Amino acid sequence: EPLSGFADPYSVTVGYANQSRKLGCEIDIGNEVTAIKIDHGRVLGVKTSTGDVNSDRVVIAAGPWSGALLNELGLDFGIKTVRHQVFLLDRGDKVVGWPPIIGDVALGFSARPDIGNVIMVGVGEDEVVGPCEYNQSVDTEMLIKIQSDIARRIPGVLDATFVGGWSGLFTVTPDWHPILSKIDGIEGLYVAVGFSGHGFKLSPMVGQVMGDIILGQTSKSIDVSSLGADRFKDGRPMKSRYDMQVLA
């Protein structure tokens, strides 16, 4: 993929925020949304830690905290949060050139170059945790395993030095595909949740799609009708396009 790559999430987020403010958006940082205000099947706004905010349209896009907000409305889409570990491995000064960007379905890890000769490796999607209480560090056992696994793809990584790591959260749905839709039965309520670790790269398109949905328009960019909130209740989960083959 000659046009593939990666971006710094902090810089991109700040860039989005700054441009949004120029376009008239108000961003309220550190003000927790505690509940969605509903009356007679219609959205009235949200309750926050500093008071109510009134609006006839609300998009729940709270990542790991989306499930709790939906559950308070009696909505359960099977959303879970899982812990994902990230390791930084330094290959040393003698190594020349960057390694490839890898997504290894068989061994269950992804990797990309970082600063200098450091490789960033992400792994683990099985440990279900709460969004506020989980181990934000990494596991020694997983470090040993992942260093052995990635050495099968990039020789020499077994000698790399562990220089840091952390754990974050994926928000996942039962079929590991996002929900992008309005909520039937509650006028003015919309959801954009469950990106399984892909939300950062998909966010520009998600913003366009959700804008179309809120305006009652068919998206001109991509058909997201299969990502509706009712697909689980109706027995229409999405199928994964990830696949692997073994050559014997």
Model region roles, listed by residue range:
Residues 78, 91-189:
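Active-site lid/adjacent beta-loop-alpha segment flanking the redox-cofactor pocket in flavoenzymes
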Residues 19, 23, 72, 209, ...:
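Active-site catalytic microenvironments for nucleophilic, acid-base chemistry
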Residues 35-37, 54, 101, 110, ...:
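Short, surface-exposed charged micro-motifs
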Residues 1-19, 63-65, 106, 142-149, ...:
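Mid-domain beta-loop-alpha active-site segment that forms a flexible
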Residues 48-98, 221:
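Central helical "cap/lid" subdomain
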Residues 1-57:
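Helical element adjacent to the flavin cofactor pocket in flavoenzyme catalytic cores
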Residues 148-248:
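C-terminal catalytic lobe of FAD-dependent flavoproteins
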